[in-house]
Amino acid sequence: MVVRTQNSESKIKEFFEFCKENEVEFVDFRFSDIKGTWNHIAYSFGALTHDMFKEGIPFDASSFKGWQGIEHSDMILTPDLVRYFIDPFSADVSAVVFCDVYDVYKNQPYEKCPRSIAKKALKHLRDLGLGDVAYFGAENEFFIFDSIKIKDASNSQYYEVDSEEGEWNRDKSFENGVNFGHRPGKQGGYMPVPPTDTMMDIRTEIVKVLNQVGLETFVVHHEVAQAQGEVGVKFGDLVEAADNVQKLKYVVKMVAHLNGKTATFMPKPLYGDNGSGMHTHVSIWKNNENLFGGETYKGLSEFALYFLGGVLRHARGLAAFTNASTNSYKRLIPGYEAPSILTYSASNRSASVRIPYGISKNSARFEFRFPDSSSNPYLAFGAILMAGIDGIKNKMDPGEAMDINLFKLTLDEIREKGIKQMPHTLRRSLEEMLADKQYLKEGQVFSEEFIQAYQSLKFHSEVFPWESKPHPFEFITTYSC
């Protein structure tokens, strides 16, 4: 038997007992591809053996973009019994197990497996002696629409989303003949009570289901945009936090679906309204001590500021992982509480990095406000950690904090102050990443092979098609030329 997992005999025994106690009929093995899509393969419980949790489960990796060619398609899923749960949506009782991907040709964890990359980033932090754990906490915003229509043909390009909350429905006659008229309006949706908030019951249902699958929630509310919401979940270590993002997205989409609606974590689905981010909180701990707490700006340590310096230094290329879609850059524009200016401040939501208010050293952390949920959380969190590590190693100065409303600065003022901005396109962020990738490759965390596979996937599946397709707005500006 070839042992490819770190599952102990006691862990395997514990899992089988869990399945028997819960009368599990199927075990659903789930893994994330490069883009961040959660995929699965299910086995009936009676077909499982203990050896499968040691040796792994074979699958065809050539069916996933950016992974293997058909001539070397065999890969192995390695179950990780650190984390599993009962799927609250399956008709038959199913246990969900997180998996990594193992390379049978090199006899090692697959270098293009996002979850394995996240684990390597955490290991790199420990190997350098810089910390025992990196805690991450994500705030994933989302939209819940009543319906969506999309067309992508050679002679027609359009989309249409709809929501009872939409200001475009003020004059609509609904099927019941009633239009109640209570709507938040553009940028008016932050925390109103019902009936303006039509999604309260769906959000509370989401919270209940999240608790069932082991996610501790602490806040739930309507967000600024029409049809937008947020559910806050407790932080965890880097890998756990990324696992939690996958859980959260699955639950939100499924609860919406079962309520006859459709949920999206797309960064900017509505023109003229706020977009959805994935604000990411980070701190590093060693010997049960928060290394970010100290005596410098707003209770931060010098160690923390160096970490921040690394993230700000590499942010333009880092965006290839944290803002991983062409749509991401329609969110990162002034005027919609989206942080496009690369600086930091305390309690200032116009900065790309915020230092949240805290009453103790243990609460010292950064909130990186530029990431969004189109990213693969394993890659986004791993890349943020690698940038911060580079900042610590090389003592990168983040510069002075800017405690002003940055949205009011003109482009000339931004240039005069020497402040960098986030890239304006996915193409530019990928180009910046390719020109600034050495810090990612330290400790063999992000391999050159993975980086090339990632950029190729993004260029061919998103950048090139987006650049080559006529846009409806171009017909307004150019058709009569």
UniProtKB/Swiss-Prot annotation:
At which positions is ATP bound?
281-283, 349, 354
Report which superkingdom the organism of origin falls in.
Bacteria
Assembly behavior: Oligomer of 12 subunits arranged in the form of two hexameric ring.
Q: Where is the GS beta-grasp domain?
A: 22-106
Q: Which GO terms describe its molecular function?
A: ATP binding; glutamine synthetase activity; metal ion binding
Q: Which gene encodes it?
A: glnA
Intracellular or extracellular location(s): Cytoplasm
Entry binding sites for L-glutamate: 274-275, 331, 337, 349, 369
Q: Which family does it belong to?
A: Belongs to the glutamine synthetase family.
> Quick check: keyword RNA-binding in the entry?
no
- Record-listed E.C. numbers: 6.3.1.2
Gene3D superfamilies listed in its UniProt record: Glutamine synthetase, N-terminal domain, Glutamine synthetase/guanido kinase, catalytic domain
The protein here is known as Glutamine synthetase
Q: How is its activity regulated?
A: The activity of this enzyme could be controlled by adenylation under conditions of abundant glutamine.
Q: Which reaction does it catalyse?
A: L-glutamate + NH4(+) + ATP = L-glutamine + ADP + phosphate + H(+)
Give the function comment from the record. Catalyzes the ATP-dependent biosynthesis of glutamine from glutamate and ammonia.
If you read the UniProt record, what top EC class would you report for this enzyme, in one word? ligase
Tell me where the signal peptide lies.
none
| Free-text cofactor note | Binds 2 Mg(2+) ions per subunit.
